[in-house]
Amino acid sequence: MATHNPTVTEIRTRFLSYMKENGHAVIPSGSLVPENDPTTLFTGSGMQPMLPYLLGQPHPLGKRVADSQKCFRSQDIEEVGDNRHTTFFEMLGNWSFGDYFKEEEIVWMFNFFVKEYGLDLKNFYVSCFSGNESLGVPRDTFSAELWQNLFKEQGLQVGIGDAPEQDGIRTTDGVTDYIFYYSEKK
């Protein structure tokens, strides 16, 4: 179990170092006010600055990058103050532009939380993309099976839930998994 509550700086540094050890170039955060994007006032997700590379443009630093993207979200500003909503936050991300897929990604995240931080598996909850019938995008059973197998290897039987909707709309990228960790209050 983790011995202390790490600071934001410690979490960011440890994540980026871990991804660098796994062959990723560490890049700085994109601008909070995106350039050349008339569709939005602020960067609201980690993937927003990555869109050109996700759509096929080569990234100057290669096929694997990691970052801590500054984000601002105002769509749920009335909810700020509960345990889930914020307006400004940093989103840690690692990106593959045609280099690796779910098998490597899920194992890396599992190892980061469990081996790097020593978090207790019994406090994890993982949700995977549940599909979108209207768009013809199927449920992501592949990711769910990968997560379940990792937990089974540690002697735990688990169920995997559906990823939550965002403002009533499910995302269409089939790799969206959410990892929740419930810590005990003392």
Locations of regions flagged by a protein language model:
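Structured aminoacyl-transfer and RNA-binding surfaces used for tRNA recognition/handling
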Residues: 2-186
